[in-house]
Structures are given as C-alpha cells and as structure tokens.
Amino acid sequence: MGAGLRGCFRKRAFIALLLLSWLPFLVRAVQLYAAANFPQMAFFAPTAETFRQFLDQQSTFVFFVTVFAGAGLVANDRRANALQIYLSKPMTRAEYVFGKFAVLAILLLMVTWLPAMMLLIVQMVFSGSAAFLGRNLYLVPAITLLSLIEAVMVSAAMLALSSLSRNSRFVGILYAGLIFFTDALSGVLRVVTRDTGLAWVSFSNDLAQLGDAIFRVPLRYAMPWPVALVMVLALVAASAAVLERRVRGVEVVS
C-alpha cells in the first residue's frame, strides 16, 4: 500500500491534480470568511446543503483521480506478470486486493472527506463559534458515511475493471464508459418516461440519491433511496466476484 501511494506522489501530474481538487475548498473557505465577517455577504452563510453541494462538486475530481491512480493498480501487475510473484510470497489474495483497494480509497478520501471536514473546521475558526456545528452535528457522520460509500463503490469498481486487462489506458476507457453509458441511459429513460423513477440505472445517480438521503436534503430523483443502496451494494458485490476470479496466483500460507 505504501509503495502504491508513494508511486502516485512521485508523479507531478498527479500532485497537480490533487492540488486542483482542493481549489473548490479554497473558494468555499473564502465564502465562509466573507459570511462570517461581512453582513452584506450573509447569503454565503453555510447550511447543511452547502456541504452536500461541496461533495457533489468533488465528484469530478473523484473521477479523474480514480482513472489516474486506479486504472493501473492491477493491470500493471498483470502486464508485468507480477501477480504470480506477489501471491507466491506469504501474501494472500485478500491481502493483495485490500492493499490495492486501500491505495485508491485513501486517495479518494483526500479529495472528499478531508476537504469537507476541513471546511467544518474553517467555518468554526472564521465564525469564532461552534454554534453551526452544534446545530448540525450530524454533518460529521454524514460527510464520513457518504465519503466512505463513494470510496468503496468507486475503488471496488475500478479494481475489478483493472483486473480485466493488462492495459491501464484501456481500463480507464472502460471505467469512463461505465460511468458515461449509465448516465446516458438514465437520461434517455428520463426523456422517454418523463420521470426519474428509473434513475437507478446510473451509478452516479445512485450515489447522489444516497447522499441526499444521508444529508437530509430533498431527494433529487423519484426513486426510493434504498433502491440506490441496493444498486451500490450490487456493484460492489459484482466487483468482488470479478476480482475473485481474475486475481489468482500461487498462495503460500505462512
């Protein structure tokens, strides 16, 4: 896991992407400062929906970090025929998969959970009070839960796709296809049915619906949030099944 993280941080392009992903945090921080210090800027005052919208904004960066850091996690090992070497050590298949999973999940939490929690801290510092957090204490578990759900779903799906090919670029295309195709299909169904009840076909929509439910804001789609949860769990389960079949080697028990 440590080697995987170090490998990402050695790449200047990835560091630039991470820095770019924190720009929305800086913008929100300026807005919070203005709301706390200038009465005429009161319209920037934070609400629970402010943090929900922030995590929505970060979805774009989640996509790029996932493709950049996740596409080659298993594919590169397959290309180098390294799976046999890894799994011939006192390392189980589960340990190998968890290590790869943890690398991507940690990176995703760095662009979702970490800046969102920092925003809560910044709000308290600028306002000089914990009153907002006291009224909205559920934001801490809400931010944590949604960030974890997103990290688990996205990391599992990307690892499964990465295990299907030796070409990391092709894996990135597969992941983009999964996201954009399901989004497009959801859009077509919405036009045809004039309803959002079938929005669950898009995994992006499922995550958004769960986020709205977790943050206690109005749901954006006409589907029960448990349906969205089932779809997310189904994707994770399918990804685990793919990894179980594709990640193989000679396992040695110490």
Feature-to-residue mapping (PLM):
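Residue-level hotspots within the lipid-embedded alpha helices of multi-pass solute transporters
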Residues: A69, L73, L108, S147-A151, ...
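Hydrophobic/aromatic residues in alpha-helical transmembrane segments
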Residues: T66-G70, L83, L114, M118, ...
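Terminal transmembrane helical anchor/hairpin motif
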Residues: Y33-E49, L164, R169-G249
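Long, hydrophobic alpha-helical segments
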Residues: Q53-N76
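A short amphipathic helical element positioned immediately N-terminal to and/or at the very start
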Residues: M1-F9
